[in-house]
């Protein structure tokens, strides 16, 4: 059967039949049906094949139907080919044994030779990490034999193996069409998807609920570096009952690894058509957020900031006097307050913003010129270098300088006075970031600096890319070419590591208190923002390509599917749609709103990339929907507040199963409040929403 440039055929082997997809005269890939099918009837589940008798193979109207049978099962496969070479398969298993089968696990396995597996992609879990010299997986969750996750744990239900060295079909992806395994009556059970080692092969595995972490079957990754027993994937199959599963196999050629993301994202849009329509208007959202900032603001003779927060007694809408501390997110909040007030032609928010920035810059100086303390302990009313102790993290410092640049640019744009103390402090910090000796030997920023300006933790670290944003904006503020020169040079170094080699992550540490080190999605967010800021300052199209490359990776963190939640969960009782929200990180399998929707939408407008525009709309609409209107959503009757994280998988912060698949965090930080506020304000002021 021909379809476009691709050709679908089959051929008999000794005891099976092979489905072959041809690309012109070249074989793109083939699937041995009997070797593909898997069945297990014991615990822990096995990856066993079974012998089958071939009953019939038919090819009618472009659809191949295969019927197989043995003493236990009859299986029918219906196979078709799309114009782009995508193989669509529906598999139906029927229990023909005459008795109930216990502890059943059904599925399929698509093998690739281990030497051909240059890179592996599992959305939000593993990115382009293949095999080590020992033959084990490099990725921390696959090491030991593999990783198989519930469909709902993956923002897009696919796994992918890349081999850029091989011509014609050098990337192969297995997509699952999400579905429940309906024979589990006591609880909802979905299919599962992952990558495992099978002898000399790396196999993409799709099974009816079994899970694996680090090669350990019947375990899920249930918390921060915690593998939790989970045996709910099994079911009993009465005689004559059927189980049906649909999936797709997609193969394409890519000249380089970065093209793998581009192709797999396009295919994901084709298969799942993600959307999240507007349910809260942008005007209402901005109104709710402005109320929240007004409620959070507090000042005294020697203090100013957006540090009030809801107490535990939500029902009386009481705000505590102070939260735990003043963080750099106060400067982001100050920009939001000022920008929104300028749009509304009101003075109050501008005055609050000015006082907040004045408080910070007048009281947070370090001995080392250019550096600043980043955290004010509200309990002791004293500054600390950071929440991590006597260090100044490069990620937070870069964000602080970048946020300061934003508010300086805003005031200049609207002809508002920028105090000399602001300009002096800002330029001192930017001058510090231009010092080569304050970088690592690779030419990027260290994980942190000591209070005297010394370089700490020289290991390669992604979070410092925020400093690039700060310098790019500094060029826009001052016109000083040194700032943009240093920024672009450092950005290229980050690009080589993060995008081309995918190697720049914080050193893996097995420890409980790992939350502050979860920088993978956020590192891409900050890289994309930095590349966008450099592009805006220079209009260099090479930098725009870096923006788009990061955007493609980031899109794989976004939920494309509105998976079912636990029946009695808090979120399931609401009209909750998880599409458009993105996973926090590889270690934190929860959803949040941290996503560069404005930069993605603008890049899509400039390049004409419809997928970028679509994804930006989906993500910003999802974030807007989370804001409380003051009517009690998410237990928050204060307008504009929102939950920080949402637990939509078998994972939670503390590995407590009662929050799994439908819970959410009760805390609501200033960071989450201001992130979505900033995105909508930027989109609104640019007239692209």
Q: What are these model-derived regions, one by one?
A:
Residues 1-5:
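Intrinsically disordered, low-structural-confidence terminal and linker regions
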Residues 6-9, 19:
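Terminal domain-start segments
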Residues 10, 57, 79, 374-383:
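Assembly/interface hotspot detector across virion components, adhesins/toxins, and nucleic-acid enzymes
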Residues 13-15, 21-239:
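Beta-strand/loop-rich accessory regions of lumenal/periplasmic or secreted enzymes
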Residues 145, 181, 212, 232, ...:
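Glycan-recognition and catalytic cores of secretory/periplasmic carbohydrate-active enzymes
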Residues 249-253:
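Short, charged beta-turn/beta-strand-edge "cap" motif at the junction between a beta-strand
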